[in-house]
Amino acid sequence: MKRIAALLTVYNRCDTTLRCLRELEKQKLPQGFIVDIYLTDDGCTDGTPQRVASEYPHVHIIKGNGNLYWNRGMLKAWEISANNQHYDYYLWLNDDTILIPDAVKILLDNSKKVNNKSIIVGATSDVKTHSIVTYSGYKGDKMRIIPNGKLQLCEYFNGNIVLIPQAV
């Protein structure tokens, strides 16, 4: 069995977070893969952690202090997940990222192509048109990498959807 820790940090976007979790739960994973979800609540006041706990009782909710923001919230989720269980992969996911049904499988397939020795960055597109890439990897001075169906080298990335193999 291969394990993936999905890591999210949230702040006052209850409906957005629930939609993201719904799409994550619907993922068509390769056989033998399971996903555990670690969600850092960085001081939500809109009921997000309570709704998540009610609708997704298996999600590990980590309490933040309101000063973690995205970066340190993701680090906290990573540290707790790594101390809790051995994971083969870590999936960074923004709560406003709506996954296509096989998004995680595509990331895993691409990771396998490079023997799980590279960070795989996903691209996101405009939710209405699906034709405009909104976030992805970058090269040089803010040159956004446009998906072309092949693996492409990037120098830095936003982090909306990123697969990090344990080997990295």
Model-inferred region functions:
Residues 42, 64, 93-95:
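Active-site acidic Asp-centered loop
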Residues 98-168:
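Acidic/His-rich active-site region of diverse nucleotide-sugar glycosyltransferases
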Residues 23-33:
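Short, acidic, metal-binding catalytic loop of nucleotide-sugar glycosyltransferases
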Residues 86-98:
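Short beta-strand-to-loop acidic/aromatic patch adjacent to the donor-nucleotide binding site
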Residues 40-50:
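A conserved acidic beta->alpha catalytic loop
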Residues 4-16, 20, 27, 40:
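A conserved hydrophobic helix/loop-capping motif in glycosyltransferases and polysaccharide synthases
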Residues 21-22, 49-50, 75, 101-112:
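Short alpha-helix within the catalytic core of nucleotide-sugar-dependent glycosyltransferases
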Residues 64-82:
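Glycine-rich, basic loop-to-helix element that forms the pyrophosphate-binding segment
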